[in-house]
């Protein structure tokens, strides 16, 4: 029985999961994903829209009061980041020039020493995008999995690293504020906003089989966690939706409760990435060009989000999965030659 259940909850789409996929990210209007071969007969009913999650790192400066129309402004974002970095340095290192890379690492080591549950340790990981000329781009992944990137034009690799560290430090500091915790009041406010957005009724919020009910279940299950922690969990479900895996699980008769319970406690790992990459290999074989189109779209989204100072893990995981799929296709072609 458990073996059958585990098989139904696998992230892969399989041959029965092909169809039109929509990259509907929770709370964000997404662009259409790659279109695979449409099934014969009438198209299946689309999945119910996912209700919006709590406000997460919008405009790159969570909780920071910005003037009207300033959200997304590079100048305002840069000013906000510098202000937070200076404030953090003042309280931890005294006045003077800040080594923001060291400050970010020190912040997470301090969290760990105070009892934060960091399953993979407190190490902050940097990744430079290969390039022989500016602008240079750097990504930084925090211990919990959240990802940020250099948000400025960076003429050197060192500057790109500092830029990524600055935006990551700002979000790390803001994430400690009490207003960034999921509380009963926050849950009620978020669910009410979701009901208003989708013209739902209160009964839907209490039924875990509805989209809004599932959203409430997710919030309730993560009460006390921070926005970054919640976003890390939501990334798994965003990827499952983008890849068509949630639709495939419904076709395999998996209930919402089963899916939520299973993936709420499963970290995003190489097995999930590999299975999703295989799905994109299959799509590319059915519809040549689907993979390259989706990769180009994903790279544009990643760059736009990076320059806006937003959390990037969903976009970056998408890109990594698609690059993995392209590599698998290349290996298959080489072996056939």
From Swiss-Prot:
Residues 26-38 have a biased composition (Low complexity). PANTHER family: ECTOPIC P GRANULES PROTEIN 5 HOMOLOG, PROTEIN LIMB EXPRESSION 1 HOMOLOG. GO terms for cellular component: cytoplasm. Residues 1-64 are annotated as: Disordered. GO terms for biological process: autophagosome maturation. The gene is LIX1L. This is LIX1-like protein. It comes from Homo sapiens (Human). It comes from the Eukaryota. Residues 39-56 have a biased composition (Pro residues). InterPro entries: Autophagy-related_EPG5, LIX1. Belongs to the LIX1 family.
């Amino acid at each position: 029985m458990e073996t059958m259940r585990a098989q139904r909850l696998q992230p892969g789409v399989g041959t029965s999961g092909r169809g039109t996929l929509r990259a509907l990210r929770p709370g964000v209007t997404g662009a259409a994903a790659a279109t695979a071969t449409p099934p014969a007969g009438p198209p299946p009913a689309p999945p119910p829209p996912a209700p919006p999650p709590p406000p997460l790192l919008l405009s790159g400066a969570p909780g920071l009061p910005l003037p009207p129309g300033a959200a997304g402004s590079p100048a305002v974002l840069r000013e906000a980041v510098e202000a937070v970095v200076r404030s953090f340095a003042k309280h931890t290192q005294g006045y003077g020039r800040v080594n923001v890379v060291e400050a970010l690492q020190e912040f997470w080591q301090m969290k760990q020493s105070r009892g934060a549950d960091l399953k993979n340790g407190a190490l902050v990981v940097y990744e430079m995008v290969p390039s022989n000329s500016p602008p240079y781009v750097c990504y930084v992944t925090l211990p919990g999995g959240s990802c940020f990137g250099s948000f400025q034009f960076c003429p050197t690799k060192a500057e790109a690293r500092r830029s990524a560290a600055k935006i990551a430090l700002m979000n790390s500091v803001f994430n400690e504020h009490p207003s960034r915790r999921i509380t009963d009041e926050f849950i009620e406010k978020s669910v009410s906003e979701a009901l208003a957005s989708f013209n739902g009724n209160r009964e839907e919020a209490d039924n875990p089989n509805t989209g809004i009910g599932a959203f409430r279940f997710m919030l309730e299950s993560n009460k006390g966690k921070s926005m970054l922690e919640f976003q890390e969990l939501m990334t798994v479900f965003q990827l499952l939706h983008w890849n068509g895996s949630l639709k495939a699980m419904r076709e395999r008769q998996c209930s919402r409760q089963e899916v939520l319970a299973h993936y709420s406690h499963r970290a995003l790992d190489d097995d999930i990435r590999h299975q999703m990459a295989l799905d994109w290999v299959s799509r590319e074989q059915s519809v040549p060009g689907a993979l390259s189109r989706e990769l180009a779209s994903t790279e544009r989204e990643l760059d736009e989000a990076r320059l806006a100072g937003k959390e990037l893990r969903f976009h970056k995981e998408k890109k990594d999965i698609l690059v993995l799929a392209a590599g698998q296709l290349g290996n298959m072609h080489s072996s056939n030659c």
